[in-house]
Regions:
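Mg2+-dependent endonuclease catalytic cores in nucleic-acid-processing enzymes, primarily RNase H-like
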Residues: 1-161
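Short, solvent-exposed helix-loop connector elements
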Residues: 163-175
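Generic macromolecular interface patches on structured domains
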Residues: 25, 106, 164, 193-200
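Acidic two-metal-ion nuclease catalytic site recognized across multiple nuclease folds
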Residues: 178-181, 185-212
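Generic alpha-helix initiation/capping and coil-helix boundary signal
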Residues: 147-148, 176, 180
Length: 212
């Protein structure tokens, strides 16, 4: 989702909500601009007033300077911080395109197909419709709507090969944004690095199976 909340604490809480909702293993965080402050906030105890839940700290897994901020020695190391340079962003763009070409990224179906073939068999979703609970109904439909928005966003982006460095620059056209593209491409970049790490440590095992 594209989140324009200015408050870094609220952004951190929203990230924790999604982390819990999807039972995620990792958080990939763009640390440019306000991202570093969000990272520091995620490394502290957070209280979610909306859900009445207290979240324990999480810890940066790939940057010792960031990790030092976390005061909890038992915090789970699961935040992958990216401080993207022009070259890193170029590598991420090339990597993401390759993943798409090789069909290594499976997108959700569009919302209309989801309603007919997936959500129609979900009793909670049908109850939300019958009781006119639009909030819960949207919660079920949102992942599919956000996927459509991601695909549309990517289609509108402009790509330029810089003549001096050969790096690929990705930028918005007009009032369009690239928040969803950044989230998805950074996530794909991290997963590829994780897969390489797993392959690199496979000497201790007879074989390793990787499933995308």
């Amino acid at each position: 989702e594209s989140n324009q909340i200015g408050d870094t604490v609220k952004q951190a809480i929203r990230i924790r909500q999604l982390y819990e909702d999807f039972n995620a293993d990792y958080i990939v965080l763009d640390c440019r601009n306000g991202g570093t402050q969000i990272l520091y906030t995620l490394q502290k105890v957070l209280y979610d007033e909306e859900r009445g839940i207290e979240y324990p700290p999480l810890k940066c897994m790939n940057n010792d300077e960031y990790a030092k901020v976390c005061q909890d020695p038992f915090a789970k190391e699961c935040i992958f911080a990216i401080n993207a340079t022009q070259n890193i962003n170029s590598d991420i763009a090339i990597n993401f395109r390759q993943n798409l070409v090789e069909n290594r990224v499976d997108f959700l179906v569009n919302s209309e197909v989801a309603k007919e073939e997936i959500l129609d068999s979900n009793q909670d979703y049908k109850n939300a419709i019958s009781t006119d609970d639009t909030t819960e109904q949207v919660d079920f439909e949102k992942p599919f709507l956000e996927t459509q928005a991601l695909i549309s966003e990517c289609a509108e982006l402009q790509y330029e090969k810089l003549p001096q460095t050969g790096a690929i620059k990705v930028y918005e056209h007009g009032s369009n944004r690239k928040d969803r593209y950044t989230s998805c491409s950074y996530g794909a970049y991290f997963l590829d690095k994780l897969a390489l790490d797993l392959l690199g440590s496979s000497d201790d095992y007879d074989y390793t199976t990787l499933i995308n």
